[in-house]
């Protein structure tokens, strides 16, 4: 028998060739009525097609395993034999009439029953459109976030859909225009910010991304509402592209950063002065993060913090001079490729050094360094959190390089002396080290989140209050909350009402509800958001300065919306944003049905999210796509609104998509979280495979069409999982894809790899065991698509190059899709569309492979006959 398909290694698809739209596909395991040769022919699934007898030596068989019909012709002589010598029987016309009448009655009853019992949505579904890639980028599906921000006890600033910026007073229920949308449009501004005194607006335009959060751009100032724009520049340069600019907490004071130096302006119109001048481009960063701090530690590009009264500025000084340099090549646009060098610490290499400084802004500039803890475990450290407690006290969290010891200190901004307030230690790693404490006005009491033992499931994250007593060096510490659930964020402290407001998973791990708790007495809790907004269980919130009002942002599962509430009775005052245009678009589409399920495994649960087609039936066979993320501490199963390429796979191509949170995931206790320590991939594979096995037990899943996809760390997992064997040691997955996969953790960022695998160089066994090179030798049969931008600054193309070397040695069947000179985050909308089409088309073709194999087999059998 001839080969069913030609295996290949090293097939490289350029951006022109891969996403060519596939032919009309039928992923549901059967042919549509327009293809099967007759209006009444019943569609066959892949199994039925494989089992159906094939016609031998005759014509009429269609491609793709169509059902074939054999006709036996009768000769004229046969007709004569039937006609000659036959006597017509006597017919009972009365009986025939009665029988016909009964048949008509029965048929009418059947038709009536079908009409009555058919759900109304089935009729409406046929009128709805399927979700397409174009929809993902259309205005109809674009969620508008008003970016509402409280600026007083009763006022907040927000932006309308058309771009106009308004000030809303909840007490008088009136609004004032601050910036017309047309003005923002005329300036081509990407971002805006209003000064604290509401006199000026700061705009940025011609913004150029650097990494995930950082960018450079031009800035202008404009008097509200109709002033002419004034360029914001350092005294020595005109028309300068700045790395950052932003207002302070008072009046019109602002700072901006140029060439890693900090400039301060007391008010608009006054010349800026350089207050920090030790910066060196690409090497010494003042007030800004380098790559490692932006991506893995602070998770923002901003590394400076104003005191509440605006008299001081704390800033981080990050020195990359000893950090090895990575070079990102640029292949297009010039005859010879060029490179962009930047400092990137990999596992075991030199890390950036960091120090925290405070400068006074009133009078002569005085720079004072805050002293790190005098602890031998802190020989190398990260600064993970900075928060002002008062105008002279600043809280700092110091984390050792191994990331298993952290110390929270309160530093005196006038002396630089730091006092230890809390210490945490773990045998594994310390999670959630960016959490900001919330302080009382005098700074003597503060609330922070720490992990507290809660029984067999390990520790959960809860609110603790620390109170310092006058004339005493000891602090009184009490836990405000407890239970086998997590506080995810502290929002506000109402000192007058003795209440703390926070978000938690107490309802369910996949939800985020808004709660309050008393800070005195028995710490009673109350859910403020439960059953408050229809079809909303995942919230974030912000409170007015007086705590009398709050903005409630619904993030799912329904279409996101923002409402304004009174804190006293939770009563909704008005809707700020409902995204009606998105609701209409959703109602006009065949959106996936979302189901949640828990699998019980030994002593833990495995939460699953299942996306099914809107037209789902138990009798149809659907392909299964497993989507993995699984970065330790993350969560894939959450009740958040999302329309993604996975939605397109379900809606337009009839796939079932499943996600799950196994060992290593967050919000289920530290025991489950820390189980993956020093063995990344091993336990995640077992849990993800358990989810797949559970789905394969369902009669509606086609066992011959199962795929896996992941990006970043999920790309590592999808590559790790793809060769996994199922029952009887057979292949589970037909195909798989990885986007920017991590393939060797010693090539990845130091802070990430060392957090989970330990310090490289001391014991490298964990690094060797987690290499995917050990797994790819089994990838001879499955289709494997690797996608990687060549200028990926987070997960270098080096990872994919190493992987491909192993794939070639293993004679694996793979395809490679590259994006020349594109960064990790795909800032271009057109490239994102191309990316999504590439992924979707790959899986569509993969899920059609069984039909192709059946067709080839049928043709070969016919040739043999």
Curated annotation (Swiss-Prot):
It comes from the Eukaryota. N-glycosylated. Expressed predominantly in brain. Glycans are attached at residues 173, 319, 404, 471, 535, 566, 813. InterPro entries: AB_hydrolase_fold, Peptidase_S9_cat, Peptidase_S9B_N, Serine_Prot_S9B/DPPIV. Residues 117-865 are extracellular. Pfam families: DPPIV_N (PF00930), Peptidase_S9 (PF00326). Keywords: Cell membrane, Disease variant, Disulfide bond, Glycoprotein, Intellectual disability, Membrane, Neurodegeneration, Signal-anchor, Transmembrane, Transmembrane helix. Disulfide bonds join 411-418, 527-530, 536-554, 735-846. GO terms for biological process: protein localization to plasma membrane; proteolysis; regulation of potassium ion transmembrane transport. Residues 1-88 are annotated as: Disordered. One of its GO terms (molecular function) is serine-type peptidase activity. GO terms for cellular component: membrane; plasma membrane; voltage-gated potassium channel complex. It is found in: Cell membrane. Its main location: membrane. It is a single-pass type II membrane protein. PANTHER family: DIPEPTIDYL AMINOPEPTIDASE-LIKE PROTEIN 6 (PTHR11731:SF20), PROTEASE FAMILY S9B,C DIPEPTIDYL-PEPTIDASE IV-RELATED (PTHR11731). It is linked to Familial paroxysmal ventricular fibrillation 2: A cardiac arrhythmia marked by fibrillary contractions of the ventricular muscle due to rapid repetitive excitation of myocardial fibers without coordinated contraction of the ventricle and by absence of atrial activity. Intellectual developmental disorder, autosomal dominant 33: A disorder characterized by significantly below average general intellectual functioning associated with impairments in adaptive behavior and manifested during the developmental period. MRD33 patients manifest microcephaly in addition to intellectual disability. Belongs to the peptidase S9B family. Promotes cell surface expression of the potassium channel KCND2. Modulates the activity and gating characteristics of the potassium channel KCND2. Has no dipeptidyl aminopeptidase activity. Homodimer (in vitro). Interacts with KCND2. Identified in a complex with KCND2 and KCNIP2. Forms an octameric complex composed of four DPP6 subunits bound to the KCND2 tetramer. Interacts with KCND3; this interaction modulates the channel gating kinetics namely channel activation and inactivation kinetics and rate of recovery from inactivation. Genetic variation in DPP6 may influence susceptibility to amyotrophic lateral sclerosis (ALS). ALS is a severely disabling and lethal disorder caused by progressive degeneration of motor neurons in the brain, spinal cord and brainstem. This is A-type potassium channel modulatory protein DPP6.
């Amino acid at each position: 028998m001839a080969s069913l398909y030609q295996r290949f290694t090293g097939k490289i698809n350029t951006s022109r060739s891969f996403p060519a739209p596939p032919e009309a596909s039928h992923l549901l395991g059967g042919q549509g009525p327009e293809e099967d040769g007759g209006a009444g022919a019943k569609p066959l699934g892949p199994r039925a097609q494989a089992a159906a007898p094939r016609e031998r030596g005759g014509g009429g068989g269609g491609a793709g395993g169509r059902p074939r019909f054999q006709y036996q012709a009768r000769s004229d002589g046969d007709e004569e034999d039937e006609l000659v010598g036959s006597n017509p029987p006597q017919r009972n016309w009365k009986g025939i009439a009665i029988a016909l009448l009964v048949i008509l009655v029965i048929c009418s009853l059947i038709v009536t029953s079908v009409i009555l019992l058919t759900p109304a949505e089935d009729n409406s579904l046929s009128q709805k459109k399927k979700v397409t890639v174009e929809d993902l980028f259309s205005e109809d599906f674009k969620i508008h976030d008003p970016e509402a921000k409280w600026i007083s006890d009763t006022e907040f600033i927000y932006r309308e859909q058309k771009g106009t910026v308004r000030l809303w007073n909840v007490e008088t229920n009136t609004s004032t225009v601050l910036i017309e949308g047309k003005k923002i449009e005329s300036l081509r501004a990407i971002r805006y910010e209003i000064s604290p005194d509401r006199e000026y607006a700061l705009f940025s335009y011609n913004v150029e991304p650097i990494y995930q959060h950082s960018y450079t751009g031009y800035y202008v100032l404009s008097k509200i509402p109709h002033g002419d724009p004034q360029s914001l520049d350092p005294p020595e340069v005109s028309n300068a592209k700045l790395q950052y600019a932003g207002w302070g907490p008072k009046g019109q004071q602002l700072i901006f950063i140029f060439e890693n130096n900090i400039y301060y302006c007391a008010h608009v119109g006054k010349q800026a002065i350089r207050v920090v001048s030790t910066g060196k481009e690409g090497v010494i960063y003042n007030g800004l993060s380098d790559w490692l701090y932006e991506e893995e530690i602070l998770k923002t590009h901003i590394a400076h913090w104003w005191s509440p009264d605006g008299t001081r500025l704390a800033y981080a000084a990050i020195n990359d001079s000893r950090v090895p340099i990575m070079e990102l090549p640029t292949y297009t646009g010039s005859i010879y490729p060029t490179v962009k060098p930047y400092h990137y610490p990999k596992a075991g290499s030199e890390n950036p050094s960091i120090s925290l400084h405070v400068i006074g802004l009133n009078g002569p500039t005085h720079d004072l360094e805050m002293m790190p803890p005098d602890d031998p475990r802190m020989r190398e450290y990260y600064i993970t959190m900075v928060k002002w407690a008062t105008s002279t006290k600043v809280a700092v969290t110091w984390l050792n390089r191994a990331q298993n010891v952290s110390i929270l200190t309160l530093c005196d901004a006038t002396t630089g002396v730091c006092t230890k307030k809390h210490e945490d230690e773990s045998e594994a790693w310390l999670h959630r080290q960016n959490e900001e404490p919330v302080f009382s006005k005098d700074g003597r009491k503060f609330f922070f989140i720490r992990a507290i033992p809660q029984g067999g499931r390990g520790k959960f994250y809860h609110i603790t209050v620390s109170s310092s007593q006058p004339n005493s060096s000891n602090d009184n510490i009490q836990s405000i909350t407890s239970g086998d659930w997590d506080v995810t964020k502290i929002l506000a402290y109402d000192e007058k009402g003795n209440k703390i407001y926070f978000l938690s998973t107490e309802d369910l791990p996949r939800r985020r509800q808004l709660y309050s708790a008393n800070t005195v007495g028995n710490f009673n809790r109350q859910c403020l958001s439960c059953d408050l907004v229809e079809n909303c269980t995942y919230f974030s919130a912000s409170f007015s300065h007086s705590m009398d009002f709050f903005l409630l942002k619904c993030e799912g599962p329904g279409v996101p919306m923002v409402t304004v509430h009174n804190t006293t009775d939770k009563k909704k005052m008005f809707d700020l944003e409902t995204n009606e245009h998105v609701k209409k678009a959703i109602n006009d589409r065949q959106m996936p049905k979302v189901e949640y399920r828990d699998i019980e495994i030994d002593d833990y649960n495995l939460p699953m999210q299942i996306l099914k087609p809107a037209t789902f039936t138990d009798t149809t066979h659907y392909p299964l796509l497993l989507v993995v993320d699984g970065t330790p501490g993350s969560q894939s199963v959450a009740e958040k609104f999302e329309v993604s390429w996975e939605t397109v796979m379900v809606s337009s191509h009839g796939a079932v998509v499943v996600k799950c949170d196994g060992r290593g995931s967050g919000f289920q206790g530290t025991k489950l979280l820390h189980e993956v320590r020093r063995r990344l991939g091993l336990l995640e594979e077992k849990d993800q495979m358990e989810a797949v096995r559970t789905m394969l037990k369902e009669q509606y899943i086609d066992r011959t069409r199962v795929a896996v996809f992941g990006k970043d760390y999920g790309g590592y997992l999808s590559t790790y999982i793809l060769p996994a064997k199922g029952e009887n040691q057979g292949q589970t997955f037909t195909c798989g894809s990885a986007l920017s996969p991590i393939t060797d953790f010693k090539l990845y960022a130091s802070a990430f790899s060392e957090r989970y695998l330990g310090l490289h160089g001391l014991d490298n066994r964990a690094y060797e065991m987690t290499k995917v090179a050990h797994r790819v030798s089994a990838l001879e049969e499955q289709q494997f698509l690797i996608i990687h931008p060549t200028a990926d600054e987070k997960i270098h193309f080096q990872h994919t190059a190493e992987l491909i070397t192993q794939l070639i040695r293993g004679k694996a069947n793979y395809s490679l899709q590259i994006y020349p000179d594109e960064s990790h985050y795909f800032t271009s909308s057109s490239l994102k569309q191309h990316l999504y089409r590439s992924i979707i088309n790959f899986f569509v073709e993969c899920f059609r492979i069984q039909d192709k194999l059946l067709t080839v087999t049928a043709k070969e059998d016919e040739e043999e006959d």
